[in-house]
Swiss-Prot record:
Gene: hypF
InterPro entries the UniProt entry points to: Acylphosphatase-like_dom, Acylphosphatase-like_dom_sf, Acylphosphatase_CS, ATPase_NBD, Carbamoyltrans_HypF-like, Carbamoyltransferase_HypF, DHBP_synth_RibB-like_a/b_dom, HypF_C
MF terms (GO), sorted A to Z: carboxyl- or carbamoyltransferase activity; double-stranded RNA binding; ligase activity; zinc ion binding
Pathway(s) served: Protein modification; [NiFe] hydrogenase maturation
Residue ranges constituting the YrdC-like domain according to the UniProt record: 209-393
Gene3D superfamilies from the UniProt entry: 3.30.110.120, 3.30.420.360, 3.30.420.40, 3.90.870.50
Protein name as annotated: Probable carbamoyltransferase HypF
Residue ranges constituting the Acylphosphatase-like domain according to the UniProt record: 11-98
UniProt-listed NCBIfam families: hypF
Keywords (A to Z) from UniProt: Ligase, Metal-binding, Zinc, Zinc-finger
Amino acid sequence: MEILFFGVKMKVRIKVKGIVQGVGFRPFVYRIAKKNNLKGYVKNMGNYVEILIEGKKEDIRNFINDLKNKKPPLSRIDKLDIEEIKGIEEFDDFYIIKSENAKDEEEGTIPADVAICDDCLKEMLDKNDRRYRYPFIACTNCGPRFTIVEKLPYDRENTSMRDFPLCEKCLEEYKNPLDRRFHAQATCCPICGPKVFLSDGKEIIAEKDEAIRETVKLLEEGHILAIKGIGGTHLACKVGEDDVVLELRKRLGRPTQPFAVMSKIEYTELFAEFDEDEKNALLSLRRPIVVLKKSQDYDKYFSKYVSNLDTIGVMFPYSGLHYLLFDKEIAYVMTSANLPGLPMVKDNDEILKKLNGIADYFLLHNRRIVNRCDDSVVKKVADRLVFLRRSRGFAPEPVKVNINNNKNILCVGAELNSTACIVKRDKFYLTQYIGNTSKYETFCYLRDAINNILRLTNTNKIDAIVCDLHPQFNSTKLAEELSEKFGAEIFRVQHHFAHAYSLLGDNNYFDDAIILSLDGVGYGLDGNIWGGEVLLFKDGKMERVGHLEEQYQLGGDLATKYPLRMLLSILYKAIGEEAFDFIKRYNFFSEKELRLLKFQLEKKLNCPITTSTGRVLDAVSALLGICFEKTYDGEPSIRLEPVANRFKGDINIEPKIKNNILNTTELIYKSYEMLLNNENKEKIAHFAHIYIADGLFEIAKKISNKFGINTIGITGGVSYNKIITERIMNNAKREGFNFIYHQRVPNGDGGISFGQGVAYILKNGY
């Protein structure tokens, strides 16, 4: 509404939607109302904030300018409805009045958890402050939000902080509109707030600050500790001693997966390289793990067993407790406390039970974690930071898409690295990271996360439920169950199409495009395993127009775990029985196993067809002796990339393409020849990456020329690979194409639920 005032005084009602709860928005409104001599009130309506003001027209105009331009740093205004109403001089002052529950289906937005602010950090380190060394210090501008809230409106009684009644001094701050802790729901102090304690697994051995000091001592001595934080639990140990890190790997069952570490800016400069974008992410209030390039001095400070890649995942402290851990150590391993494939533990009893035998000691506290939330992870690829995992610090804040939609859509995601998503109007509410839903405990976590996001977005009615095409996914079965419960239609989206739609929605780009959808596995429209797809998006429809050569996945899922099987399968196609003689050099298969594998290949028994990019890269990794057994998702190809990075020369490549199909048998055969000719592994690894990148780009270019399309994009788990993605990007830009890539949602399966929502809307009219 354009405010054209007639008369000296007037009354205006303002409805503010967006991130306006738990971010100091009402105190801010109070202050600018008082500053501008206005009367009225501000009220939290559960899913929006209502403001009623009366006063002089110029004062109201100034108030609205302040509202738009001086809002709190954590807030976000998505919509501002302003209407003039009749009557004046109803109020004698300006008030913050009691919140109301949401009365309609309009969604509210719960802010994400944010790192401790500079003001709170300063107070916590001030010996004269009453919150000196108090690990749960928080205010309006920082601290837990999503992880403590049970329902809207975001008031203390609706959070786990209701277990801690405010003391007199905290209550005074909480009620003072001019105080930084006015209506800050996480407000507390050592007298009235949560308490930290240290356990040896049997009994409490230290409490309060003594527990923290003893934890630091135990870490320095080389012990492994479970540390309960804001959204879950970490396992921590020192980074510099091989035996300590190896012991954690042994106990946790993670033999090679790189560990993330927690450090501080002055220390990180010693062992890692980072640019301005990466530095800003590390220091941001959202505090994700940022994947950084190791520096030349890395080995001076870190055990080689922390990360066997050329990168290291680093996060900075994001709670008061984290800061208090740093004394002598420059960094700690800080990895999620979960067994492979299972959710991170969060409740004290569960922590003590499930981490028994893994952690030596347990630093716990008595504040309930309502919503589990893993650390977010970002990585710089193609000149931008992209999400490997979008969780703490970001979820459940919505992603806005410029798309017309009047339905409530529930999207249940894929199977691995999963999230779910609620779509309401133009807002896509992704859940926190869920994980591998083929595991029962994680499947239950998915169900709980869906119920929670429905509650927090005030969603009672679902019009459509979207799932993957794969009939055996647990998420597909859940979709069928929920479809019946809500009386909602069910809509299925092919996995790689969902990746492509995710890319389109992420970029608010809905014109024609060629999209490379590349990953390890996805159920194809033909019933085969896809993963190296060239997709045409034209006139609002998605179509597969090219792909990698079909290969046999020897032993089905066993070929994903043991990449030598994939190598043997492709080499057998290239050189016949000689492949079996060659594979013996790795001393991996027994003679009996080789006879069985030969029989399987000859008869095509349990040899599903795949076009997966991941499986081809896995085969190269095995060929070069880099990885023979996958112990975490994507390991063989992830470990191949740093080897390829070490090659600095140029390679002339002419990928073999026929009928828009990239010949990957040729890729493996050429790599095999190079190995026999004693070419170095770095060159062969680099060759494989460039062959795939250039080959797929050539197919995309040919199709774009045929249809007159000027946009090329890349998505899927393989698009985290810097060599492949940046090669395709540079090729596209050099040839004058518009290149699109992810920026707001994960490239991988964490973005599938988002893409499912976009797919449904576009299929039903845009």
